[in-house]
């Protein structure tokens, strides 16, 4: 995982390339904070070693929501860190977590996340739906009335707002946790005749 230090990742890549010399592509999960501890030169070196794509769990581009879910960064840092990947030649997916802001902040979550994503160059925008698991802090907050989760219909409305504002040239993939399965290149601009 990209959470490891540059030196540790480099050692792992060396081992992989020695044992499997035909490997050309390595993909891994990442957080925005995992990019922060790597310089552009280090990212370029990791790209040369075969780390070609990251799947970044952004979840939201809304500062209130990012703080609420304790991501450990603000929206401006998403842009700053992810643009380092563009410069290093590493492609990336960005994820939007549908429903994570709750009812009161749903609109801002959708709008502000689209605004952030529109400033970046993801190859894929992935969306997943919030699932409240037993024995989690968010489930307890829901039971105490401190968090008001979206209904399935409200989640689709939030997703619609997000997609209407999304203008980046990327493929869209929805996770099975969303009530509607969407996949395709329909975010790409259409050519007028």
Which residue ranges define each predicted feature?
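Mid-domain alpha/beta scaffold segments of enzyme catalytic cores
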Residues: 7-12, 16, 38
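Core AdoMet radical
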Residues: 1-6, 20-37, 51-78, 123-126, ...
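Alpha-helix N-cap and loop-to-helix initiation/capping positions
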Residues: 4, 8, 41, 70-77, ...
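Short, small-residue-enriched loops and turns at beta-alpha junctions
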Residues: 2-5, 32-36, 99-105, 133, ...
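Conserved C-terminal portion of the radical SAM core fold
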Residues: 76-138, 152-176
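Acidic (Asp/Glu)-rich catalytic clusters
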Residues: 13-21, 43-50, 83-87
């Amino acid at each position: 995982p990209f959470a490891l230090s540059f030196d540790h990742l480099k050692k792992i890549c060396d081992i992989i390339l020695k044992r499997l010399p035909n490997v050309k592509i390595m993909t891994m999960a990442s957080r925005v904070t995992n990019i922060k501890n790597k310089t552009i030169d280090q990212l370029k070196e990791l790209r040369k070693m075969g780390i070609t794509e990251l799947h970044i769990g952004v979840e939201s581009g809304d500062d209130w929501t990012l703080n609420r879910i304790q991501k450990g960064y603000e929206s401006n840092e998403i842009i700053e860190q992810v643009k380092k990947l563009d410069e290093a030649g590493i492609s990336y997916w960005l994820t939007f977590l549908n429903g994570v802001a709750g009812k009161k902040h749903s609109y801002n979550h959708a709008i502000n996340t689209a605004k952030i994503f529109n400033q970046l160059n993801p190859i894929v925008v992935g969306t997943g739906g919030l699932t409240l698991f037993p024995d989690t802090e968010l489930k307890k907050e829901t039971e105490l009335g401190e968090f008001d989760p979206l209904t399935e219909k409200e989640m689709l409305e939030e997703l619609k707002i997000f997609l209407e504002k999304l203008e980046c040239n990327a493929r869209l993939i929805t996770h099975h946790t969303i009530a509607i399965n969407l996949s395709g290149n329909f975010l790409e601009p259409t050519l007028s005749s």
